Amino acid sequence: MAVFKVFYQHNRDEVIVRENTQSLYVEAQTEEQVRRYLKDRNFNIEFITKLEGAHLDYEKENSEHFNVEIAK
């Protein structure tokens, strides 16, 4: 399993505005699994990136909201 960081907007019908971008962390095997896990939410997904090594460690140490959801 890997941890993915998802950048998204809360409303799929609105134009993406950088200042409104939110993020969340999802543990899954693939990016596709992350997208399936989030498909029922009304998110406008901007970008999904896999976190590994030093990048993952940095997010754990410096993100106030580092709560990982587990994709099922």
UniProtKB/Swiss-Prot annotation:
One of its GO terms (molecular function) is DNA-directed RNA polymerase activity. The keyword Nucleotidyltransferase applies. It holds the Pfam family RpoY. It is an enzyme of class 2 (transferase). This is DNA-directed RNA polymerase subunit epsilon. A non-essential component of RNA polymerase (RNAP). Belongs to the RNA polymerase subunit epsilon family. GO terms for cellular component: DNA-directed RNA polymerase complex. Keywords: DNA-directed RNA polymerase, Nucleotidyltransferase, Transcription, Transferase. Gene3D superfamilies: RNAP, epsilon subunit-like. InterPro entries: RpoY. One of its GO terms (biological process) is DNA-templated transcription. It catalyses: RNA(n) + a ribonucleoside 5'-triphosphate = RNA(n+1) + diphosphate. Its EC number is 2.7.7.6. The gene is rpoY. NCBIfam families: PRK13667.1 (NF010188). RNAP is composed of a core of 2 alpha, a beta and a beta' subunit. The core is associated with a delta subunit, and at least one of epsilon or omega. When a sigma factor is associated with the core the holoenzyme is formed, which can initiate transcription. It comes from Staphylococcus aureus (strain NCTC 8325 / PS 47). The keyword Oxidoreductase does not apply.
